[in-house]
């Protein structure tokens, strides 16, 4: 590994989607989008801990297939249209206090937010973390081919997430993946994965 990184992945996986029912549990290339995200995180050498935040028993059952994945019950006020950054902050600032005995909270150098509805993401997460450190960023988010933030990946220095303060040096990286909102999007994402045009889990 190029850098001394102890990253924690947070995967938001609610099931109260409005446009596509139980979106994060939709199947793409034989796996739910949630499973793609978990396995994407597990392929990283830098990510040492994975937490799925959800209100769903169904999601919890899927996570039981992965011994090293923790599940955090998402509070009701962070369902519906809550900002995903607030979901990330909630996990780090509240849930991580439970794990202090395991030193995860203190060891963490970076938080990696992985949204499941981008199953055909095109970047290797460890390459992104190397890019983040090499460019001395405090915060990094992915954008689509038009330069619009797409939410696929969000990397933030742990010190900012712990304190809930604003980061200063912000960067972006292209991730020309599918932002799934419909059945057509599911088909497009699967096509991209089958063509080998992704770092899918």
Name each model feature, range by range.
Residues 6, 48-50, 110:
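Residues at the starts of beta-strands that form the adenosine-phosphate
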Residues 20-43:
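Short, well-formed alpha-helical segments that are part of the catalytic scaffolds
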Residues 36-106:
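Conserved N-terminal catalytic core of the sugar/cofactor nucleotidyltransferase
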Residues 82-90, 94, 106-110, 115-184, ...:
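Conserved core of the sugar-phosphate nucleotidyltransferase
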Residues 26-27, 52, 113:
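Conserved SAM-binding loop
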